[in-house]
UniProtKB/Swiss-Prot annotation:
InterPro entries: Kinase-pyrophosphorylase, PSRP. It catalyses: [pyruvate, water dikinase] + ADP = [pyruvate, water dikinase]-phosphate + AMP + H(+); [pyruvate, water dikinase]-phosphate + phosphate + H(+) = [pyruvate, water dikinase] + diphosphate. Bifunctional serine/threonine kinase and phosphorylase involved in the regulation of the phosphoenolpyruvate synthase (PEPS) by catalyzing its phosphorylation/dephosphorylation. The keyword Transferase applies. It is an enzyme of class 2 (transferase). This is Putative phosphoenolpyruvate synthase regulatory protein. Pfam families: Kinase-PPPase. One of its GO terms (molecular function) is ATP binding. Keywords: Kinase, Nucleotide-binding, Serine/threonine-protein kinase, Transferase. The keyword Transferase applies. It comes from Nitrosospira multiformis (strain ATCC 25196 / NCIMB 11849 / C 71). ADP binds at G162, A163, S164, R165, T166, G167, K168, T169.
């Protein structure tokens, strides 16, 4: 029998996300890039508010200590505006991916203008109107979660429907937080399946309805975490509810998608696209 070659185990690496403000932007960009290397084990560390030389020097020390511990160069993603702070971070024993300098220079050349070098502009409350739109959208999503409210359903930009525990609530909150979308959600339950018609609260807003479905096996896993050994969580009941919800949505002409293996971000993006909602990040 031939001896099969042993595939070396991937080395565990550390990824740092550095920012002079919240770190949200660099985390999103770094995660998007690293998701292309799913077989590489990673430890992730975010260091926000690196807005002074002293903090930058401390960050370099932390990065170098990790290099010694891992015996592998850390990966450093940064969105640092101050060139002096960037220079300090460049001295670290790491692969430094400076997300700002990569893009700012060609943008300055193309636009014929210097960048402002202001820190944290993308997450600053510079537009009170946009800020309050998000706050009001979040409050609306909470008030209209799981069919709780009995009024103002026609105010929703979109109302998500489907069996319970298919990802409707977190998607609504994400749409509200990121885009200021007024998103409600209404669970389809066995009583609706028996009547074979939509609940009265959402019957007159059919054009704003969008559905989620899910594989019964995955729904069984999710519900079992909350109510193990219950009829509600049983695989048989999950199969019944998923099939019945899909049948009801088809009958009502409601577009729907399979949420089984999609992230909240992917679900929200799909809803924006399919429901033709304005996509504006605040």
């Amino acid at each position: 029998m031939p001896i099969m070659p042993i595939t070396p185990k991937p080395i565990r690496r550390t990824a740092f996300f550095l920012s002079d403000r919240t770190g949200i932007t660099v985390e999103m960009l770094g995660h998007s890039l690293l998701s292309q290397f799913e077989n590489i084990p990673l430890d992730e560390i975010t260091l926000p508010y690196i807005d002074s030389k002293a903090k930058a020097t401390s960050a370099v020390r932390t990065i170098n200590e990790r290099y010694i511990a891992d015996e592998a160069r850390p990966l450093v993603f940064s969105t640092l505006v101050n060139p002096e702070i960037r220079l300090i971070i460049n001295s670290a024993d790491a692969l430094h991916l400076d997300c700002f300098s990569i893009f700012i220079a060609p943008l300055e050349a193309e636009l014929g203008a210097r960048s402002s070098e202001n820190m944290g502009r993308s997450h600053r409350v510079s537009d009170p109107t946009g800020y309050w739109k998000r706050i009001n959208a979040i409050n609306y999503a909470l008030e209209h979660d799981d069919g709780l409210s009995q009024k103002n359903w026609n105010r929703a930009d979109v109302t998500l429907v489907g069996a319970s525990r298919t990802g409707k609530t977190p998607t609504c909150l994400y749409l509200a937080l990121q885009y200021g979308i007024y998103a409600a959600n209404y669970p389809l339950i066995p009583e609706d399946f028996q009547r074979e018609e939509l609940p009265a609260q959402i019957r007159n807003i059919r054009s704003k309805l969008f559905g989620f479905t899910i594989h019964p096996e995955r729904l069984h896993e999710i519900r079992s975490e909350r109510k193990p050994e219950s009829v509600y969580a049983s695989l048989k009941n999950c199969e019944y509810e998923v099939q019945s919800a899909e049948k009801l949505m088809r009958r009502a002409g409601i577009p729907y998608l399979d949420a089984t293996s999609k992230s909240i971000e992917e679900l929200a993006t799909a809803v924006l696209h399919e429901a033709k909602l304005e996509r504006k990040i605040y």
